[in-house]
UniProtKB/Swiss-Prot annotation:
Segments of skewed composition (Basic and acidic residues): 559-575
Native source organism of the sequence: Ajellomyces dermatitidis (strain ER-3 / ATCC MYA-2586) (Blastomyces dermatitidis)
Residues bearing glycans: 349
Cofactor: binding details: Binds 1 zinc ion per subunit.
Alphabetical UniProt keywords: Cell wall biogenesis/degradation, Disulfide bond, Glycoprotein, Metal-binding, Secreted, Signal, Vacuole, Zinc
Described function: Inactive carboxypeptidase that may play a role in cell wall organization and biogenesis.
Encoding gene, per UniProt annotation: ECM14
GO biological process: cell wall organization; proteolysis
SMART domains the UniProt entry points to: Zn_pept
UniProt protein name: Inactive metallocarboxypeptidase ECM14
Propeptide residue interval(s): 22-174
Region of interest (Disordered), ranges: 170-191, 542-592
Primary subcellular site in the record, as a coarse category: other
């Protein structure tokens, strides 16, 4: 980046100042931070921190001119921060809720839990071959347990002991952001930190993500273009970044990879990870031979917020909102699940009469506005712009899984199953080698299987309908050979409320996974003598894992002391299900 002229540098800095003063998108499309809970953090601040765009501008100076940054007290380590209690609004919304993890061992148990969840309209957070996490009101717990077999009535533990506080802590905190003490750009002996620490030190609202994407397109016009996929139900733009260097007058179809996140609004780590991978590819172009060659042969489309309306809603009203925000036949139950509304094997009959279901796929295929917009854009690119989509990564959370087609059923065998499995295993390996985080690999259809301790593995029923998924539509209807859904961190300690300290480590894991995908797509074309593994090691510095996968977690500060006063005595845990049994692997939530 040092080849920029002095005039170019001044232009970039002027652009950063301009963007900080004039929003790139209308206020209607990108509303500001919610007044609560963020404003509460600032009440006791003696000195306001610099604005985000000011810090971004400063980071450009550091990066381009090599000026060491001022000292910053980044979150983490031994630094102690003031404790703030969740405001009354969050207490009112979430204090009566609990997240329970059920351990499942038989098909009958799964079937009973599925039926009970449907009857009570419960919010299933995540499920694997061993457990299911469900959020419900505490006063509904007796009704749920009463519908379950005796073996399940005590086979559960609470995951998050203080849901309002955990929700509150997931929002950015101005009091926890490093302050500059008015020192500006004084030299420091501290080694230069990565510019990513500024944008990726916290989750960002849509009002920041949009201008940030525009800034990247303005700074790197040679290989970055800001595009629009379409409009949401509420009229917001669905922005995307096209990253690549397309040769002029090339008659061959342009091979293109789509990486998207935010289909489910509450899954903030997916949004941040899409942005992180985009930033990493953009800023590494010209510095790494593999990445430069990759972007000359492939375009990457990064869509961080496929569901902008729902994402804004999680910032302004309900942090745990999942669907989009369009109207349904029931005015008090808005929203369509954007991963259950796609046209291939749409299974709306499963939830068609229940718009209140969290997995409601609409009353017809492509009922979800944003999914319909993305499908139309993909069709237009294929038919009118000579684009060939070759890979699709759909980032979700949580449970740490790499899933491949098909989702709707296990009966059909994907024609390239062997290649799908091989690449999926490579993706999981890359993630494990980055930060020692383990991801399981399976077909998205598999649902639940019996414990591996048993000789025979039986396929269990699934907790929710899996027809109409984006994963299957891209694979079958578009012909994308490598279509995957990645369910990111964690495995339940925080669920959708993953602490901000996980943003960069998760981003690095998925960036390395994308590099494995790139190597798979490129093959040996022009890289016979290149050591990819050495190149990855050069580009990445592995972080220590924030959340360890081990089963040896120690109890800390009473975090394992659960309040079970709301559970009827007859349903309280007994010795039939040992929490420390092999395979249970419940990791306790830790204080930060």
């Amino acid at each position: 980046m040092r080849q920029f002229t002095h005039g170019t540098l001044l232009a970039i800095l002027a652009l950063a100042n301009t963007i900080s003063a004039i929003p790139s998108f209308s206020a209607n499309n990108y509303p500001a931070h919610p007044a609560e809970p963020l404003a509460l953090f600032a009440q006791s601040q003696p000195q306001a921190p610099l604005g985000l765009w000011t810090r971004l501008r400063n980071s450009v100076i550091e990066r381009l001119w090599g000026v060491p940054p001022q000292q910053r007290n980044h979150r983490g380590g031994n630094k102690q921060y003031p404790f703030y209690s969740a405001p009354a609004s969050l207490q009112a919304r979430y204090s009566d809720d609990v997240v329970l993890r059920f351990r499942l061992q038989t098909a009958d148990e799964v079937k009973a839990l599925v039926e009970a969840s449907n009857i009570l309209f419960l919010d299933v957070w995540a499920s694997t071959d061993e457990w299911v996490d469900i959020r419900l009101a505490k006063d509904v717990v007796p009704s749920l347990l009463g519908l379950l077999p005796k073996s399940l009535q005590t086979a559960h533990v609470p995951l998050i002991h203080d849901l309002p506080q955990t929700v509150y802590e997931s929002y950015p905190s101005s009091s926890q952001r490093p302050t500059d003490n008015g020192r500006g750009f004084l030299p420091s002996r501290e080694s230069s930190s990565d510019v990513t620490n500024i944008f990726f030190e916290d989750y960002q609202p849509l009002s920041v993500i949009g201008p940030w994407m525009r800034l990247l397109a303005s700074m790197f016009p040679s290989h970055v273009q800001l595009i629009s996929i379409g409009s949401s139900f509420e009229g917001r733009d669905i922005p995307a970044l096209r990253v690549g260097v397309r040769p002029a007058n090339d008659p061959k179809p342009r091979k293109t990879v789509i990486i998207g996140g935010g289909s489910h609004a509450r899954e903030w780590i997916g949004v941040s990870t899409v942005n992180y991978v985009a930033y990493s590819l953009i800023t590494t172009y010209g510095k790494s031979t593999p990445i430069s060659t990759l972007l000359e042969q492939f375009d990457f489309i990064f869509i961080p917020t496929i569901n902008p309306d729902g994402y804004v809603h999680t910032w302004e009203t309900d942090r745990l909102w999942r669907k989009n925000r369009q109207e349904t036949s029931l005015p008090f139950c808005p929203g369509v699940d954007l991963d259950r509304t796609w046209g291939f094997e749409w299974n709306g009959n499963a939830t068609g009469d229940n718009p209140c279901s969290e997995s409601y796929g609409g009353d017809e295929p492509f009922a979800g506005t944003e999914a319909r917009q993305l499908a139309g854009w993909v069709k237009e690119q294929t038919e009118q712009h000579n684009v060939k989509f070759v890979a699709y990564l759909d980032l979700h959370s949580y449970s740490q899984q790499v899933l491949y087609p098909y989702s709707y059923s296990c009966l059909p065998r994907p024609p390239n199953l062997e290649n799908l499995e091989e690449l999926a295993m490579g993706i999981a390996k890359a993630i494990r080698l980055t930060n020692r985080q383990s991801y399981t690999v399976s077909s998205a259809c598999q649902g639940f299987t019996a414990s591996q301790k048993k000789v025979k593995l039986d396929t269990f029923p699934r907790m929710e309908s899996t027809g109409g998924s984006a994963l299957d539509w891209f694979y079958n209807d578009v012909g994308v050979k490598y279509s995957y859904q990645l369910k990111l961190r964690d495995k339940g300690s925080y669920g959708f409320l993953l602490p901000r300290e996980n943003i960069v480590p998760t981003g690095k894991e998925v960036f390395n996974a994308v590099m494995v995908l790139a190597k798979f797509l490129l093959g040996s074309d022009g890289f016979e003598g290149l050591n990819w593994e050495a190149e990855f090691q050069r580009l990445n510095e592995a972080d220590k894992p924030i959340l360890d996968d081990g089963d040896d977690d120690e109890e800390e500060d009473g975090q394992d002391k659960k309040d079970d006063s709301w559970i009827p005595d007859e349903y309280k845990n007994d010795n039939d299900h040992d929490d420390d049994d092999d395979g249970w692997g419940l990791r306790r939530r830790r204080k930060r």
